[in-house]
Amino acid sequence: MMMERYKLDIVTGLYAYKNHPEVAVVHMFNEETKRHEPISRFDENCELVEVSSAGAGALLVRKSVYERIVTELYEPPFQVIGAYGEDHSFFMRTRKLGIKAYCAWKVQATHLGYKAVEFSPNLSPNTICTDYTVTGFGTTKGEQQHGNAN
């Protein structure tokens, strides 16, 4: 395992944002803008690249990192700092302690989530379903209506 081979404290795999699959959830911190900016290209000859921040979805962290945050900074590791989310806040603390993080960018994971699905009466011709004749009543105007829905 790379974490052991290179004696690293933090290693993340690579995965994409749920809503932007073309953007990886790994960042470098831009000191000028004070923003975490996504990394879009990786050196194909390297197993690992240093990162400033990453999502926690494929993250390996040594226990000693959490212990140092609590004992040296007196803060919970993932407590939000200002407008930053939990993940960026965690990595801001590790940078403050001089702990480097790396991305094993060839280790890729999927970003799980949920998707709201709404019914659509406009079925494609390839949809397999059974047509039923039903009788209904009521319209949005309050008038009675009878008919069949196919």
Segments predicted by a language model, with ranges:
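Conserved catalytic core of nucleotide-sugar-dependent glycosyltransferases
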Residues: 1-77
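C-terminal catalytic/acceptor-binding lobe
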Residues: 63-64, 68-150
